[in-house]
Amino acid sequence: MILELKGIYKEYQQGKMKVPVLKDVNFSMEEGEYVAIMGPSGSGKTTLMNIIGCLDKQTEGTFFLDGVDIKACSENEMSDIRLNKIGFVFQSFHLLPKQSALANVEMPLNYARVPKKERRERALKALDRVGLADRVDFKPNQLSGGQMQRVAIARAIVNNPKLLLADEPTGALDSKSGAQVMELFQRLNDEGVSVLMITHDADTVSYTHLRAHETLRHL
């Protein structure tokens, strides 16, 4: 099992008040699944993504990622998990504007201290997987929105993560580019990548396999 969350609560302190965001969330995901978590604005999707992505910790409950108890991890251990086990894809791409597509995809490998030759080979392979072998030297302002998101996906998969975590990945794209990105996620999942997508868009859920989605609701 790649993910297991039991009795997850999350609250934030605002002055003297504690504001609940997640309440008794239970969720599990097997390796190789493609699942969408769907919910309206304000339902806690981003908070849940931050917990699953090891960017934040729950207030109560247990969370295991690939068998590791995340709440027991130090900040350095969580950083290593983010680098080596999770690939992130965001709505706004988060590409370095002055760097080429190749350099953007190489970035996680720099942090992992991968040798230069191997770094380039792996980044080129990732760009080829997303259909951008002919755009390796292009900078973000020379790419379409759909191409920028594919660069971001290549960056997310270059470290061969256990989990690909996508937060509203088509939110900034037109319908055609969005459909192409969703088809790419589907192909990556067919190749064995575990994909967890967080969305409010019912149309994107149709691309997921087997167990279609879990729904978050307002507290």
What are these regions (language model features)?
Residues 209, 214-219:
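Single conserved hydrophobic/aromatic residue that forms the stacking wall/gate
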Residues 2-207, 211:
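ABC family nucleotide-binding domain
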